[in-house]
């Protein structure tokens, strides 16, 4: 579940509220599906992330596929411009989907999202742990994007040094060593004597990692066979938001 990477344009917004025609708003997408556990190791994931483009991208034959996948998108605001209506719509729908599947009695519920705190709070409200065995997981690809930002504070963009830096830190994250990554970044900042602006950027990165550390026990998630990245939603961002919303006259 995540904010859509592809933004749907809204035409004819009320200019009295400061919105101009053609300005963009962020849709919220949710997906509910059932999938069998798939055990991997940190090295399995690391190899997949850093595989060369020309290498085979075929999925292992024993990898389970999502079943009964339902996707829903909402692009809604109240009169004050708040996104609360779309959050209520998507999380209410997901809670109903989960209840209808009787998943609570059969298997754990994985809540896989980006790092937006308001979405995690909504998850607690609509999918409370007293009713569901919830495993909160930060989408690995969002965590990796922050490691790339950190790499570019120390190394030139596109350099081999930046790539090696990212691979090293991502492996630590996959091993469940988030605090070690944070300490390493801060030590490097001290040694490299980063500028004030870069230090501020680094603290934002470290803050993101620390705030989400409880959702980054990837070594445990992999051993349990849980999904750790929202590829299902990445596809939905393209098909639901770009295709269906734009066809309905929203562009």
Give short role names for the model-derived ranges.
Residues 1-251:
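Catalytic center-proximal scaffold of phosphoryl-transfer enzymes
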